[in-house]
UniProtKB/Swiss-Prot annotation:
GO molecular function: protein heterodimerization activity; protein homodimerization activity
Species: Leucoraja erinaceus
Transmembrane segments: 46-66, 83-103, 109-129, 174-194, 211-231, 251-271, 295-312
Signal sequence, renumbered to the chain: none
Lineage, uppermost ranks: Eukaryota, Metazoa, Chordata, Craniata, Vertebrata
An example Gene Ontology biological process: bile acid and bile salt transport
Homology family: Belongs to the OST-alpha family.
Biological role: Essential component of the Ost-alpha/Ost-beta complex, a heterodimer that acts as the intestinal basolateral transporter responsible for the translocation of bile acids (such as taurocholate), steroids (such as estrone sulfate), and eicosanoids (such as prostaglandin E2).
Name used for this protein in its record: Organic solute transporter subunit alpha
Length: 352
């Protein structure tokens, strides 16, 4: 007797699955609207939703406390704004996840909004490092006599033979472009996805080789890797110098948010698409996977928000930007003791 291979088995239509196998109709329907969801919630579901909403509110309260602290303790307005925008990432993701929890049909759009905001975080993280030196001019002046190792992850860690470089202004512009392209391409590609979705061409359930959804996500993955590389290069060179500014903690939280908001969503979506996450009325398998991801993100961002509060509570009176003349004046002031010592040595030798 011939045995049919898995790829030869004909998929049953939804009507046959509902009639012959008693599969719920909700497994083939779009996500429920909010009022339908609320009417179908059990007391246990209401308790879970209320607890997750309360955690979101606490995450917002933690961020507001961070803002008040930064307004009072960070004197430079440029550095203060950068820290405030970057520390808001866990709060924004928690809010969008909570909205997706209560409005299941908006999950795709709130996920896009969170991803677009975090795309700006690549550029903000680069600015935090640059402003930690005192601005672009101060950083270039400091790194003029240093070499930087560029064979770092995530795209060049397998190339240890790459030479160390001096960070010139032209190379710094390439670093800025690498981080900024994520902030530009993510909103542009997500907007393109929404336009294609209205025409039925953007389907998150379609993982075939001809799927526009698959190719857009692959392009976003490459863009993310290229955007993370310049930030990682500068971080590895600056983490010891900026240890008092808790740069390592800030960068670790940045990477944690990147993994939790991107990789976790992809893993759960793949499991749901492969049938490892079953449907549970009123949710289909895909919607249930998205709800699971939102619930996990709310809990995770609550704890990330607490760690963010610890990492960003640092009094800072140093400027985040200096003009060229100010940098040259600081360099001259730093060189004056060395020049005085050299003159003293010459005078002592002449007396001898």
């Amino acid at each position: 007797m011939d045995v049919a291979h898995p790829e030869e088995v004909t998929r049953f239509s939804p009507d046959i699955l509902m009639e012959k196998f008693n599969v719920s109709e909700a497994c083939f329907l779009p996500p429920p609207i909010s009022i339908q969801l609320i009417l179908q919630l059990t007391w246990l579901d209401i308790g879970v939703f209320a607890a997750l909403t309360a955690m979101t509110v606490l995450t917002i309260a933690i961020y507001l406390e961070i803002v008040c602290y930064l307004m009072d303790k960070v004197k430079c307005p440029i550095k203060r704004k950068t820290l405030m925008w970057n520390s808001a990432a866990p709060t924004v993701i928690a809010i969008t996840s909570c909205l997706g929890l209560w409005v299941p049909r908006a999950i795709m759009f709130v996920d896009m909004a969170a991803a677009m905001y975090f795309g700006v975080g690549f550029y903000l993280m680069l600015l935090i490092i640059v402003q930690g030196y005192g601005g672009e001019e101060a950083m270039l002046q400091h790194l003029a006599t240093h070499t930087i190792r560029i064979s770092t992850g995530p795209c060049c860690c397998c190339c240890p033979c790459l030479p160390h470089i001096h960070l010139t202004r032209q190379k710094y512009k390439i670093f800025v472009l690498g981080a900024f392209q994520v902030a530009f391409l993510r909103p542009a590609l997500f907007l393109l996805g929404v336009v294609l979705w209205t025409n039925g061409l953007y389907d998150p359930d379609d993982w075939s080789s001809t799927s526009i959804f698959l190719w857009l996500n692959l392009f976003l993955g490459v863009s993310t890797i290229l955007g993370l590389w310049p930030v990682n290069v500068l971080f590895r060179h600056s983490k010891v110098l900026m240890a008092d500014q808790k740069l390592t903690c800030k960068f670790a939280l940045f990477q944690a948010i990147l993994i939790l908001s991107s990789l976790q969503n992809s893993i759960i979506g793949t499991l749901a698409g492969a049938g490892h996450i079953g449907c549970a009325p009123p949710y289909s398998a895909r919607t249930r996977g998205q709800q699971m991801n939102n619930q996990l993100l709310i809990i995770e961002m609550f704890f990330v928000g607490i760690l963010t509060r610890i990492s960003y509570r640092k009094r800072d009176d140093r400027p985040g930007h200096r003009h060229v003349g100010e940098v040259q004046q600081i360099v001259r002031e730093c060189d004056q003791p060395a020049i005085a010592d050299q003159q003293a040595d010459h005078s002592s030798i002449s007396h001898i």
